[in-house]
Design a protein with these regions (language model features):
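Non-heme Fe(II)/2-oxoglutarate
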Residues: 1-82, 99
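Catalytic core of non-heme Fe(II) oxygenases with the double-stranded beta-helix
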Residues: 79-169, 173-188
Length: 188
């Protein structure tokens, strides 16, 4: 997936790829989670037929490498923002038939971005979006742009956390890793 920007200053999505996706497989081993994060929090979220586990920031072993990669992708497309602090991170495993309803990670008053790393391939059937992700971009002028993705392992979506998004039902198990960061505007 080539790095490129979709959207405008109101809402945006960057499509990219993260070569070192194996680093995120480490977080699937529950032994690395502090005990308070072993609880499935899916019932508190918009995940259906799947499990969602929060990850304690102290267990996040590859931030030193991933955060600069995100900033590099943001700089590459010319967005004037600087990633600051880690906000939250979690993993989701969708079971057969699992999906996620449309939701946002933030309200408009919080400057936050989300990064989703796909750890499994989407359904190979080119006629369907099973296992794909959808998003709706609002351009600030009342227009909506509907986007659909069929990500492969290692594909990365970085988006403003106010972007409405979700996932289509899966035919097989699917895993994703999600990280939210705060950001601030860069003034040139």
């Amino acid at each position: 997936m080539k790095t490129h920007l979709l959207g405008n200053q109101h809402q945006w999505i960057i499509e990219s790829h993260y070569e070192d996706k194996e680093e995120f497989d480490f977080h699937w081993d529950k032994k690395v989670f502090p005990s308070e994060t072993r609880e499935d929090v899916s019932d508190q979220t918009s995940t259906y037929r799947g499990k969602q586990f929060n990850i304690h920031p102290d267990a996040y072993v590859n931030e030193w490498k991933f955060k600069p990669h995100l900033q590099e992708q943001i700089d590459k497309v010319g967005l004037p923002i600087q990633i600051t602090d880690l906000c939250a991170l979690w993993i989701i495993e969708y079971k057969k038939g699992g999906w996620q309803k449309a939701h946002r990670h933030s309200d408009p008053n919080v400057k936050k971005l989300s990064a989703v790393v796909y750890l499994t391939d989407a359904d190979p059937d080119p006629t369907t979006f099973h296992g794909g992700t959808f998003a709706y971009l609002y351009d600030g002028e009342g227009n909506t742009h509907d986007l659909c993705y069929k990500p492969n392992r290692g594909d990365l979506l970085i988006f403003k956390s106010t972007v409405l998004h979700g996932s289509y039902p899966v035919r097989e198990s699917k895993k994703v890793f999600v990280v939210d960061y705060f950001y601030e505007d860069k003034y040139v």
